[in-house]
Each structure stands twice: as C-alpha cells, then as structure tokens.
Amino acid sequence: MKTPLITREGYETLKQELNYLWREERPEVTKKVTWAASLGDRSENADYQYNKKRLREIDRRVRYLTKCMENLKIVDYSPQQEGKVFFGAWVEIENDDGDTLKFRIVGYDEIFGRKDYISIDSPMARALLKKEVGDLAVVNTPVGEANWYVNAIEYVK
C-alpha cells in the first residue's frame, strides 16, 4: 500500500500538471474534437478518433490527480530531521564493493520519470529510515540481504 506523503515540490509539480491539463490541453483537444466531428462521418475520421482518445486520457489523468491530491499529506523539512534519514532526504549510500548510490526518498506520486528518486514504500527507503551517517542498513532483496552504509544525508530547505 502506498503511503500518501509528498514533498512540497512534488505537490506543486502535480498541481502544475493538473492546471496545464485542465486549462490548456483539454480545451485545445476539445476544439479539435468539435472540429473533426463537424466534418461528418466519424467512423473513418482519424482526427476525431485520435483526439477523442486523447480527451479520455486527459480526463482520466485529471480525475486521478484531483482524487490523489485530496488525500496527499505535504511533508515539509523540519530541523529535527537533521542528521537522520527521513522522508524528503537526499541520501548517499555505499555497499561493501564500493558502489555508491545517491537518491531522494519521496512519495509514490513523485518517482515517475526520476531515476534519482525512490518511494518511501520501497525496501531500500524502509531500511534507511532513522539511520545516521555511518550506520549500516540491511536491505531485503529478492536475492537475499544487501548491506549499505550511509555516507551522507541532506535535506532541501
């Protein structure tokens, strides 16, 4: 189950997407559908069919964003988090082989399209929560346990 948390930046990004879809793209596509429908036979009208499909996709995304944003809890930075891994932290970790990773722990709705973001619900994030620099985090993976050491923790303030 996904945890309904989001960073302020993530919430603003979703809000901008919703505004763009509802105020700019949807009216434009609606005009195209109306124009294509006025041409007559809709069964062989590619413009009509494509734009009608796009309109359904926009409406689906708008419904999802509207419902999703009502339930999300914005988590802002707090000075009490400093020095430990919590939601919103940028974390650099290293394994026994010397491989390093750097990512930010964010909400489920923020991870798409970002390789450097992981969900708070992921096994890695769960293992890292409340750890400090130098601590060992044992992550359960499909092939067994993996050991990762926390090298750095940063917060966007």
UniProtKB/Swiss-Prot annotation:
Family recorded in the similarity comment: Belongs to the GreA/GreB family. GreB subfamily.
Functional note: Necessary for efficient RNA polymerase transcription elongation past template-encoded arresting sites. The arresting sites in DNA have the property of trapping a certain fraction of elongating RNA polymerases that pass through, resulting in locked ternary complexes. Cleavage of the nascent transcript by cleavage factors such as GreA or GreB allows the resumption of elongation from the new 3'terminus. GreB releases sequences of up to 9 nucleotides in length.
Protein transport keyword on record: no
Species of origin: Salmonella typhi
One function term, GO molecular function aspect: RNA polymerase binding
Superkingdom per UniProt: Bacteria
Identification of the protein by name: Transcription elongation factor GreB
Keyword annotations: DNA-binding, Transcription, Transcription regulation
PROSITE patterns to which the protein is assigned, alphabetical: GREAB_1 (PS00829), GREAB_2 (PS00830)
Any one GO BP annotation for this protein: DNA-templated transcription elongation
NCBIfam families cross-referenced by the UniProt entry: greB, PRK01885.1
Entry keyword annotation includes Acetylation: no
